[in-house]
Amino acid sequence: MNIEEADVGLAIRHAGDKIGYVHIGESHRGYLGTGNIDFAAIFDALVAIGWNDYVTFESFSTAIVDKDLSLKTAIWRNLWDDNVALARHARQFVELGLETASRKAELVKLAHLSG
């Protein structure tokens, strides 16, 4: 969606319950939150549509990925070399992002009820 859509959050909201799978990755295929993807907008949209399923994460690094695959996928940088640390970071990043989006949505709902 990042390539095809001008507003990923809006695209997620528009697709709504038609979404069956969420697959994310950073713009440079490294650690989430260190590139230029607007994950806050993505998490806000996922909360808005009631997404309550898995979020899959993908990342590549020349230190880990097979050399032939690195060439075929145009990976030329070593952005990480510890699978476990990367996976832990991704899980925490997604969980925190969804929790933050949920809290924001609740605050908006409360503001509308009291306003």
What are the residue ranges of the model-derived segments?
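Histidine-acidic metal/acid-base catalytic patches
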Residues: M1-G115
